[in-house]
Each structure stands twice: as structure tokens, then as C-alpha cells.
């Protein structure tokens, strides 16, 4: 068996990744209950002791445990189980598809898979040589190989399927005509068959060819006790149709001499009736017409009736026919005259050397011999015709690329009486053994020596001497001696036998031992004694001219097809003998097999009783020895599993090295040997696993080759996956690009509608109303439904449901605003409302809290047609009134920040275009029914927001009335979002170019400016008043401040000395290169900035931080900074003594006036990560003031009036600044 596929990679069987420093994600081990425990060793190369006995013991263990297959490297050893083990089901067959030898248990399916895969992969012809003795299971193995190949060879068209069916149909057909029950095997092949399956370049079967060898035609006329004739005779006589029985006179097998002589009619395990139907079905599948089938069974009937012709000795001593009716019926079947049949059987035509033709009457033995010769000739030629007819149907229907041959030939035979047939059979087995020796033992060792490979020679027996003993011409071998004896005394068979025996006795060969009446040949399988009597006559293998004349006189066209050659009465040249034919066939077979890559199946018969439980160790040991399994094990353990020329090796595996291939092309410029070495190097094959010869690369273990094959298969898979991935990415780019274009188009189109609506707002105001800055922003769009009333979900949908707004009403505008409520006895005030406008009505919706629950209800629903006018002012305020003029209700006075947008939608929805907008200095509305009132609008710069009081609205000045909206601002530049993700498509869009706005694939955050060191920071001038004011903890009124005792202000303190630079307790590092973080926990760095390392990991990442934040950064980007030595502590001059209050005794004072100078600050600052001390607690009796220094003693002092005045001034300045900011913010408001 050659090399098969590597296993497919398991997608789930990948190493578990773990986080840095985390616990590895190791799966818990599970006990596999499905795996079958191995008995013995499945490969005999693994046995501890190499001996015939150890091999036999291992085979016995496996046989007892229903394991019949064992490997010797790539050779399969099969032990016949004599029972069905259920190991040839479709499920088992599927499990071997695409698997190599090491993945699955030994099986004949693995041999078939290997042969089929190697044929497709290496484009080499393959052959499977099945050897072993009769009954060891060769035919069954051949059928299983055909079953597997037919299943996996693919092809869905009708022609290929028909070819498969015909190939499988040849098994039952040829078994019926070529197999028989023997003492050693119930289904013994009595012929040899070499089936050559032909495949096209795609590995699909397109045809087949069958060559048959050594049909045992003597079985037609004679069998030993308890054996049977060929199966077809019993199938036909038991299962023939009534038409055949009437036309051909078919009776039960017991009625015919040829089927009843051995006394065995039935066989255990064989159903002749069922197999007869299988034979008929096989004939139909192969394409035999009904007429052809009729002629086949007519010839079978003729053979059966020929055997029933009996003779007796006449008065003249010659043979006469006992029953003329039998001859008459045979003449009817052969379509000849009965007289011609009697003449052909009872009259012998002799042709001496002088050319005179002599007709000699035959005696009874001679007549019976001629009768049997007639039957054998018909059956032999009928079998050849069937094989030729099958080949005609299996002719290749397309161009043939490669083939797989399956050799099924009966095995080595040793009987008590061995004659010419056994000599031919054993000779062919010797030739097959010679092939095995040459290919696995001799040729392998010779190749190692020729290629200069380091090798330990193994001793083995070369059976060439035995083959030469049988087939040699000079000196003459056994076949040549037979032919010479026939030439010397061709007319007398007994004289020929004696001449042949004399020649055998004169031979000198260690493997030949002459005896009295027989001779012994020491075959590789054992010593066999051959009987000389009749052996030369069988070697003649020529049909009497009388029988040939009989066939020539037949009026049946089919008989002329069986015997196409006309009889040449003048030809005296000796025809080829049977020995010549078998030698030519055997040599042709050897030539065919040597042109293919062989796979071997060595079959072993465990016992002679066909028992499924018996294991005869003695018999099996004998088979182990003559099959040479021990030598095969030794060579396999010491040899190389694979060898190939450098050119073919590189051609096969150059894809595996980046130095020999690029994009599938061969780019290596050196010689093929260095290329092969480069491939093995790049694939990490250990040097111990291969050797380089003179012309070939040798790989020791099959696992290595499996790995190379698997990597090659994965290469194509990966390339296909890469192309698919790029193609999918390309399609995704097109889809995304189209989506982006559509999105931008819709955005521009929809935005254009909103912008056009905004321009209509300018037209409605007629350039007479001042505008707010927000209303003129370029990004301002009139969206309309701000509350989402038209949405199906969200708060807007709940409002719609609460007011029972019909679904048919389209919401044009919605927002929140306020309404001016007038209550009796109270001033008017603003109340929040919800404004909703549809195509027909304007709704004012209220929200009330009732029993702690919000209730939403329609307060007013004003039809748009009822609105007579809308009144607004010329100022920038948001107030407007809806002039309804209802006699029962007042007009609503509303405020809404989106008033202009509301007017725009209202004008478009107003029926008849009757929208009347009044713009004046005041707002007009009916405060009470039919009672109009004017609301004045005045400009007040002190008002940040619109303020209503006493029928007057105070508002700030706005933008000029003729102001127009600013242009739409450009969007903020953002990084281009990649269309796809993955290694093959670069980020940044279809072009794959990174965006100018990105660093990597995300924007780099702006660096926060790092504060300058304290030592280099300039000290600002200190305000005398502000310098004495710490954090304000309480606002002190001016009156209370003025009531305090006056204290002169202290002199300004001297500027403090620059503090030393803080020394970090954590290591500082400088950033060498700019780094953009790729995830949330990665920290983006700017080149040159200083960071602090908080945590170091061994995986190349450190946890860093600075003023901008913290995160993980690569170690290689950082360089440690050596901190400088701390500067000397500088002392500042003492301030002059402060005049004024006497020394106070107490501990809570802010300063001690009697102390001449404050102590110097500490040399080291607190750590950067430490939080500052909390401010002092507020005091009830005044403001707490801290001096510039700190001391152990403290005092309490009352602020002076000048100090209070300075504090008040500072507070006013601060309040003014805050108001200015608030004013600016209010201006930005709606």
C-alpha cells in the first residue's frame, strides 16, 4: 500500500490562548469510551522481537479478537475469518475516505484508498497484488477493493455510473463460470484474473479490461470426491426456466455425469438458485442480449449432455455408443449431424511425419478421452468468449489517463495428486513471489546501494532459481523438457512421459528431486510432488482435428464464434504447448505489474476446516515462512517508506517552501537536489528522517510523507480560502461603497429639504424680526417632529396614545414650550405645555401630576382654519399668540424656541394659504373673549432670558432682522472607516491607503500639555490682598466686616523660592517612538513625553501612566530616565516684623506675630499621586486666614477694615466676572 491522504485538521483542536499571566485554558481530560482497545500490534514492524513465531502469535491474538488485518509497513496481511464480521458496510467504507494508513485500523479499504489516491496524486498506474494459498480470501479482498473504488471514484454522469455497475457485475458473472467448490475453499477461483480499471484525468472510471489466466478446464469433466464442478452448472440445472428445460433438455444435476461424479450437489453458504438470478442480472447489466444468453446456456447444456455419452467395447474391440438418443440430442444442440458427432468421437485422425492421413478407430478409453476433450474445448472457449464480451462492454468511453490493476489468481496448491495444472498454478505463484522479492527486497537493497544510502543489508531467499528451473530454455527447464518429449514421441503419450522423466532425471538443480514416476520441486511455499503420468499429454493442449472438423460443420453461428479458426489439414507444424502459453501469459503479467506501483495483500488461511474459530498455528506458521513476512518486517524496519527522484519530488512539494514557489509558480533557480533539500528544510523535517541519494530523495517514516502531503493539501485549501476571502471582501467593499453613496445621497437630499424649509422661514419673517444666534447656525435644520409623535416607539408614541391622536393624522411639528396662564386674583405665569401640529389641527397638551401619576391630556385642539392670525414682535423673543377669536375662550399666548419652524409648517398646512403673520412692536391677542390686549416687548440688556411681567416682555437685543443663516459647516475630519476587517484588506477604504487623519486605524488623541517643572516655573507677582485670602469658606457681609476693629495691613511677603522638582517614587521612562493604542486598554504615547511605569509584565507590555491617563504600552517603546540629584534647599529672607496687635495666647490663630521668620518648606514635595489636604473647616465667627508659612504655634486674629475692603473688592470682581460669563452663555441659549 502506498501513501494516502493526511488527516484533515480539526478546527476545534487548537491550543487555548490565555491572557498574560493568567491561567491556561486547558480542557478537562475525558475518557474515550468509543475507542477500541488494540490487540497485539496493528503493524508488525512494531513487534519487540522479529521472528516467525512472534509474527504468528500476534496474528493469532488478533484473529481471536476478530481483527483479521495487520500491516507490515504498507503491506497488508489478511487472515480469512470464514465469517461475516460486519466490516464492509457503507459506514465503514465512508470512514476510510480521505484517510491515510495511520489514521484508521488496518483494512483492505485502506489499501484501496491508498491506491486510488496515489493514482490521482502522482499520476502513476497502480496495481494490487493479492497472494496466498487457496481459501485464504484473495477473491473476497479483490471484490472489496472494487467495491471501495467504485464508491469513491466519483462521476455523476450516466456513462460513468454505468461503467461502475458493469465492473461490479463482472464479479458474480465470472465467479459463476470460473469458481468452484474445492476441499479447501467453497468458492475457490479456478482461474486467474487481472482486472485493470481505467480512469480519466479526473479519477473517474471510464472503462476496464480483464485478462484471464489458467482456467482449470479439467474440472469440467472430473472432480475429486466432495468437490464440485463450476458453480454455473449447478445454478443452471437447479434454476433453469421451463423454456430452457424444454429446449435444452435440462434436468437436475444428479442426472449428469459431469455434475454428479464427485457426489456433491450442495454447499453450505451457497444458494445456487439465488446466485443464478444474480448471474442473469449481471449478464443484463453487462449488456448481453437475450440471444447471447440463450447461446451461452445452449453450450452449457451441450457440455452436460456430452458427458452423458457412454461407450462400450464392440465386437471388434473398438468403442461404440451405448445410447444413440444422447448423441442425437447433442447433435441437435450443436446443430450438426449425429453421424458427424459419432465420427468425431470414435474415429481418431492421425498425421504421421510422412504426411499420410490415417483414420484410426478409438477404443473405449480413447473415445471417452475424446468426449471429455470436446466438453473441455467448448467450456474453455466459452469462458474466453465471455471475458472478451465483457471487455467489449467495458471498453473505455473516454481518454484513459491512469489505471488500477487488481490481480486475483488462485494461490499455491499442494494436493496428494499434483499434475500439470498444479505445476502451472504454482509456477505463476512463483513468478508473483519473484515480483514481490524484486520490488520489496532485492530491488530495494540494490537501489540503496546504487543511491549510496546508508543501509544494513538483509538476507533473503531469491526464488529466481526456482522460476528458471521451470521456465528456462537453456539449460532446458521443466516446460522445455515436456515439449521436447512431445516432439520425440508425440503419438504415444506413455512414451512421451517416459522421455520427459528421463530428461528430469538428468537435470541438476538443488530444488529438483526426481523420484520413481514423479518429481519434487522445492517451491517457496513448500515441496510439491508432481505425478508424471499424463503430464505431457496435458501439455500438448491441442484439439483433435476430428473435433475441429465437427465444429466447422456446425450450422450454429455462435459455435463459429467460439472456434473461429479453420482447420488446416496440411499444417504439420507443432502448435504452442500449454506450457508455452502459460509462460507467455505469466511474463506478460509480470511486465504489466512491473509498470505499475504495487500494493500488496498477503492472505493467510487459518485452518483447513473453514472454521471461524480455529487457528492452526502450525499451518499458519508455514504460511508466514513461505510468504517471507519475517524478511519483509526486517526490511521495513530498516528501510525507507518513500523514495522519489529529485525532479518529481520538487515538482510535487515545491509549493511548501517560499524559496521554491511564489503564488503557485516554481521560482527555484538551482538544481532539483538542492531544491528538494530546501523544501525539507523549510518544512522542518529532521535530517534523521531523510537521506539524499544520487538521484532520489529517501524519506524514512511514512508519517513524514503524510505530513508533507497534508501540508500540500492545506496549501491549496489556504489559497482557495484566501481567494474566497479577498473576493468576499471585494464584494463587501462594493456593497459598502454603494451603501455609503446611497447614505450620503439620502443625507444630502433630506438635508436639502430641511435647508429649503429653513429658507422659507426667512421669507415668512419678511426681514422684520430680530433673530437669535442659534437660529442662524449653519447646522440648524427644521426637523419638525422633535418629540417623535409619529414614531411607533418611545415617549412620543406614548404621548400620541394618551391624547388618542388618530393614526391618519400626520404629525408635522412637535416640541415643548410654555403658555401664559391668567388666573383670577393672581399674576399671570408661564406653564409648560406640549405643542403638536398636524395637517388639520394645532394641539396644546398639558401634563399634570394627579395622585403621583402623570396624566397627559389635550388642553386645546385648534383647527388650523380657525387661526385668523399669528402675532409676534420685531424683537428676538420667542413669544407669539394665536388669534382664534373664540367668543368663549381667550387666545393662547405661547412661547416656543422653534417658533419660526412652527410658522413655516403652519403656513404650508394652512388651508387655502390663509396664514396671516402680524409682526409689530407688540403682540396682539384676546386676553379675554372679544377683548384684545397688546403685550409690549422691550429690549433689556440686563435680562439673560425672556421675562414677562405686567404685560411686558423683556428681552435682549438680537441679530439684525435681515440676517441670513450661515452656510452648512463642514463636518469634523474623521478617520476613514475600513470597509472590511482582516489581514488581506488594509484599513482606510478600498485603496488600502491609511487616512491622513489617522495613525494606524484610529485618530490619535491630542496630547495634554505636560506642566512645566516647578523649578522652571516663573513666580507671578502676589496681590497683597489676594495673597492673604485662602479658599473662601463663607461669604461675610460688608456690615459685619466694617464693625470689626481696624488693623493695619501686613506688608507683602517676599516671593517664595522656586520649589525643587518633585522626585517620583516610581520609575520614569521616556517615550522613544510614537504609539497609537489599538484598543481601550492600550495607552497612546507621544514621542519624547515622560511616563511612569506602574506594573511590568514579561510579555512585552508595561502598565504606564501620566497626566493624560494610564494604560498598557509596549516595552520596546520606553527608555528609563535617570532622575537628576535634588537641588540644594534655598532659604528665603525673613520678612520685616509686622507692627500692630499684641501677642495673643491661643492655639487657633492663623499666625504668630512674635515669630521672626516662618520655617522653610520641606525639601521634598508629596508624591504626585497623593491627594491634597482638605481645606480648613469654616468658622462661625469670621473668615479663617492662613499665612504663607506654617508653624507649630497658631493664633487668632480679626481682619482689619482695610483687609475687609480688599476682600469685598475681590468678591465684587469675581461676581462681575461670573455674570459676564453667564451673560455670554445666555446669549448662546435658544
UniProtKB/Swiss-Prot annotation:
- Which key words are in the record? Actin-binding, ATP-binding, Cytoplasm, Cytoskeleton, Hydrolase, Motor protein, Myosin, Nucleotide-binding, Repeat, SH3 domain
What are the start and end residues of every segment in region (Disordered)?
Answer: 1-32, 945-1018, 1033-1065, 1116-1230
Q: Where is the composition biased (Low complexity)?
A: 1179-1214
The residues covered by the TH1 domain are 771-961
Q: Which residues form the SH3 domain?
A: 1064-1123
Q: Which GO terms describe its biological process?
A: actin cortical patch assembly; actin cortical patch localization; actin filament organization; endocytosis; mitotic cytokinesis
The text the record gives for the protein's domains is: The myosin motor domain displays actin-stimulated ATPase activity and generates a mechanochemical force.
Which protein family is it in?
Answer: Belongs to the TRAFAC class myosin-kinesin ATPase superfamily. Myosin family.
Entry protein name: Myosin-1
* Record organism: Sclerotinia sclerotiorum (strain ATCC 18683 / 1980 / Ss-1) (White mold)
The uppermost taxa in this organism's lineage are: Eukaryota, Fungi, Dikarya, Ascomycota, Pezizomycotina
Amino acid at each position: 500500500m502506498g501513501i494516502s491522504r493526511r488527516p484533515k485538521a480539526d478546527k476545534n483542536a487548537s491550543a487555548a490562548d490565555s491572557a498574560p499571566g493568567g491561567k491556561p485554558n486547558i480542557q478537562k481530560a475525558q475518557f474515550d469510551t468509543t475507542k477500541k482497545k488494540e490487540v497485539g500490534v496493528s503493524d508488525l514492524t512494531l513487534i519487540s522481537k522479529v521472528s516467525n513465531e512472534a509474527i504468528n502469535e500476534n496474528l493469532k491474538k488478533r484473529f481471536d479478537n476478530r481483527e483479521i488485518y495487520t500491516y507490515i509497513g504498507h503491506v497488508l496481511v489478511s487472515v480469512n475469518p470464514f465469517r461475516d464480521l460486519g466490516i464492509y458496510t457503507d459506514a465503514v467504507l465512508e470512514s476510510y475516505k480521505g484517510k491515510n494508513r495511520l489514521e484508521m485500523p488496518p483494512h483492505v479499504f485502506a489499501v484501496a484508498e491508498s491506491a486510488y489516491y496515489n493514482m490521482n496524486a502522482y499520476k502513476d498506474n497502480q496495481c494490487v497484488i493479492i497472494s496466498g494459498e487457496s481459501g485464504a480470501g484473495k477473491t473476497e479482498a479483490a471484490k472489496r477493493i472494487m467495491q471501495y473504488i467504485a464508491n469513491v471514484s466519483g462521476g455523476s454522469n450516466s456513462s460513468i455510473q454505468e461503467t461502475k455497475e458493469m465492473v461490479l457485475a463482472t464479479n458474480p458473472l465470472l465467479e459463476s463460470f470460473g469458481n468452484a467448490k474445492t476441499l479447501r475453499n467453497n468458492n475457490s477461483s479456478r482461474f486467474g484474473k487481472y482486472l485493470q480499471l481505467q480512469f480519466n484525468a479526473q479519477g473517474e472510471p471510464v472503462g476496464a479490461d480483464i485478462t484471464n489466466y489458467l482456467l482449470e478446464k479439467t474440472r469440467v469433466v472430473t472432480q475429486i470426491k466432495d468437490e464440485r464442478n463450476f458453480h454455473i452448472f449447478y445454478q443452471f440445472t437447479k434454476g433453469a426456466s421451463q423454456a430452457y428445460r424444454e429446449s435444452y433438455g435440462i434436468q437436475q444435476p444428479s442426472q449428469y455425469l459431469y455434475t454428479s461424479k464427485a457426489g456433491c450437489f450442495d454447499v453450505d453458504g451457497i444458494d445456487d438458485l439465488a446466485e443464478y438470478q444474480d448471474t442473469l442480472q449481471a449478464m443484463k447489466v453487462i449488456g448481453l442480449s437475450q440471444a447471447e444468453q440463450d447461446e451461452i446456456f445452449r453450450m452449457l447444456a451441450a457440455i452436460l449432455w456430452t458427458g452423458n455419452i457412454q461407450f462400450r467395447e464392440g465386437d471388434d474391440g473398438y468403442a461404440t455408443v451405448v445410447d444413440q438418443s444422447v448423441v442425437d440430442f447433442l447433435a441437435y444442440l450443436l446443430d450438426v449431424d449425429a453421424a458427424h458427432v459419432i465420427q468425431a468421437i470414435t474415429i481418431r485422425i492421425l498425421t504421421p511425419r510422412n504426411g499420410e492421413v490415417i483414420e484410426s478407430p478409438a477404443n473405449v478409453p480413447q473415445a471417452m478421452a475424446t468426449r471429455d476433450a470436446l466438453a473441455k474445448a467448448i467450456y474453455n472457449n466459452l469462458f474466453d468468449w465471455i471475458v472478451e464480451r465483457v471487455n467489449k462492454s467495458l471498453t473505455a468511453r473516454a481518454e484513459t489517463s491512469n489505471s488500477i490493476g487488481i490481480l486475483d489468481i488462485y494461490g499455491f496448491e499442494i494436493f496428494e495428486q499434483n499434475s500439470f495444472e498444479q505445476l502451472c498454478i504454482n509456477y505463476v505463484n512463483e513468478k508473483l513471489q519473484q515480483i514481490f522479492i524484486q520490488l520489496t527486497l532485492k530491488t530495494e537493497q540494490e537501489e540503496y546501494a546504487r543511491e549510496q544510502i546508508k543501509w544494513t543489508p538483509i538476507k533473503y531467499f531469491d526464488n529466481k532459481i526456482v522460476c528458471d528451473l521451470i521456465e528456462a530454455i537453456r539449460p532446458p527447464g521443466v516446460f522445455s523438457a515436456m515439449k521436447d518429449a512431445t516432439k520425440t514421441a508425440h503419438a504415444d503419450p506413455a512414451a512421451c512421459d517416459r522421455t520427459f522423466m528421463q530428461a528430469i532425471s538428468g537435470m541438476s538443480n538443488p530444488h529438483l528431486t526426481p523420484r520413481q514416476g514423479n518429481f519434487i520441486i522445492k517451491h517457496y511455499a513448500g515441496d510439491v510432488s508432481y505425478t508424471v503420468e499424463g503430464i505431457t499429454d496435458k501439455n500438448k493442449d491441442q484439439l483433435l482435428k476430428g473435433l475441429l472438423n465437427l465444429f466447422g460443420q456446425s450450422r450454429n453461428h455462435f459455435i463459429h464464434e467460439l472456434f473461429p479458426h479453420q482447420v488446416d489439414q496440411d499444417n504439420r507444424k507443432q502448435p504452442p504447448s500449454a506450457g508455452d502459453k502459460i509462460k507467455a501469459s505469466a511474463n506478460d503479467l509480470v511486465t504489466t505489474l512491473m509498470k505499475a506501483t504495487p500494493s500488496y495483500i498477503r492472505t493467510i488461511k487459518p485452518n483447513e476446516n473453514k472454521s471461524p474459530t480455529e487457528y492452526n498455528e502450525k499451518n499458519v506458521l508455514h504460511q508466514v515462512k513461505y510468504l517471507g513476512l519475517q524478511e519483509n518486517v526486517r526490511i521495513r524496519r530498516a528501510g525507507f517508506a518513500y523514495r522519489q527522484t529529485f525532479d518529481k519530488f520538487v515538482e510535487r512539494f515545491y509549493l511548501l517552501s517560499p524559496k521554491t514557489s511564489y503564488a503557485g509558480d516554481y521560482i527555484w533557480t538551482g538544481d532539483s537536489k538542492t531544491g528538494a533539500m530546501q523544501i525539507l528544510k523549510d518544512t522542518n523535517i529532521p535530517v534523521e528522517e531523510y537521506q539524499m541519494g544520487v538521484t532520489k530523495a529517501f524519506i524514512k517514516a511514512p508519517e513524514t510523507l503524510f505530513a508533507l502531503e497534508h501540508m500540500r493539501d492545506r496549501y491549496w485549501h489556504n489559497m482557495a480560502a484566501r481567494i474566497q476571502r479577498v473576493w468576499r471582501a471585494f464584494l463587501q467593499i462594493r456593497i459598502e461603497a454603494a451603501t455609503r453613496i446611497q447614505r450620503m445621497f439620502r443625507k444630502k437630499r433630506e438635508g436639502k429639504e430641511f435647508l429649503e424649509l429653513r429658507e422659507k422661514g426667512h421669507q415668512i419673517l419678511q426681514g422684520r424680526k430680530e433673530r437669535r444666534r442659534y437660529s442662524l447656525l449653519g447646522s440648524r435644520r427644521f426637523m419638525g417632529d422633535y418629540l417623535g409623535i409619529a414614531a411607533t416607539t418611545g415617549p412620543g408614541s406614548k404621548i400620541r396614545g394618551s391624547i388618542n391622536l388618530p393614526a391618519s393624522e400626520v404629525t408635522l411639528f412637535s416640541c415643548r414650550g410654555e403658555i401664559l396662564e391668567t388666573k383670577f386674583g393672581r399674576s399671570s405665569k408661564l406653564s409648560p405645555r406640549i405643542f403638536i401640529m398636524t395637517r388639520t389641527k394645532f394641539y396644546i397638551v398639558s401634563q399634570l401630576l394627579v395622585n403621583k401619576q402623570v396624566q397627559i391630556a389635550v388642553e386645546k385642539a385648534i383647527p388650523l382654519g380657525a387661526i385668523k392670525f399669528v402675532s409676534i414682535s420685531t424683537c428676538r423673543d420667542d413669544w407669539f399668540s394665536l388669534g382664534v377669536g373664540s367668543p368663549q375662550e381667550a387666545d393662547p399666548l405661547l412661547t416656543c424656541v422653534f417658533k419660526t419652524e412652527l410658522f413655516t409648517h403652519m403656513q404650508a398646512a394652512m388651508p387655502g394659504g390663509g396664514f396671516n403673520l402680524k409682526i409689530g412692536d407688540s403682540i396682539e391677542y384676546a386676553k379675554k373673549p372679544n377683548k384684545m390686549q397688546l403685550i409690549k416687548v422691550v429690549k433689556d440688556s440686563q435680562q439673560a432670558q425672556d421675562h414677562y411681567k405686567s404685560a411686558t416682555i423683556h428681552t435682549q437685543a438680537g441679530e439684525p432682522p435681515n440676517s441670513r443663516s450661515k452656510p452648512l459647516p463642514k463636518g469634523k475630519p474623521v478617520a476613514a472607516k475600513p470597509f472590511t476587517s482582516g489581514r488581506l484588506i488594509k484599513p482606510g477604504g478600498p485603496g488600502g491607503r491609511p487616512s491622513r487623519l489617522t495613525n494606524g486605524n484610529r485618530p490619535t488623541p491630542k496630547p495634554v500639555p505636560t506642566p512645566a517643572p516647578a523649578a522652571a516655573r516663573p513666580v507671578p507677582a502676589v496681590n497683597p490682598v489676594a495673597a492673604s485670602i485662602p479658599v473662601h469658606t463663607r461669604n461675610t457681609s460688608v456690615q459685619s466686616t466694617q464693625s470689626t476693629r481696624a488693623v493695619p495691613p501686613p506688608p507683602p511677603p517676599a516671593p517664595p523660592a522656586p520649589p525643587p522638582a518633585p522626585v517620583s517614587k516610581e520609575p520614569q521612562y521616556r517615550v522613544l517612538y510614537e504609539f497609537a493604542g489599538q484598543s481601550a486598554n492600550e495607552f497612546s504615547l507621544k514621542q519624547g513625553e515622560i511616563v511612569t511605569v506602574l506594573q511590568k509584565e514579561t510579555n512585552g507590555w508595561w502598565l504606564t501612566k501620566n497626566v493624560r491617563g494610564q494604560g498598557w504600552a509596549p516595552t520596546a517603546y520606553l527608555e528609563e530616565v535617570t532622575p537628576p540629584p535634588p537641588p540644594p534647599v534655598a532659604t528665603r529672607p525673613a520678612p520685616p516684623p509686622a507692627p500692630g496687635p499684641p501677642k495673643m495666647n491661643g492655639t487657633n490663630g492663623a499666625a504668630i506675630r512674635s515669630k521672626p521668620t516662618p520655617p522653610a518648606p520641606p525639601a521634598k514635595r508629596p508624591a504626585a499621586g497623593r491627594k491634597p489636604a482638605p481645606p480648613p473647616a469654616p468658622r462661625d465667627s469670621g473668615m479663617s486666614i492662613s499665612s504663607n508659612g506654617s508653624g507649630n504655634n497658631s493664633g487668632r486674629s480679626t481682619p482689619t477694615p482695610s483687609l475687609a475692603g480688599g476682600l469685598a473688592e475681590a468678591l465684587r470682581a469675581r461676581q462681575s466676572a461670573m455674570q459676564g460669563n453667564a451673560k455670554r452663555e445666555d446669549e448662546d441659549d435658544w
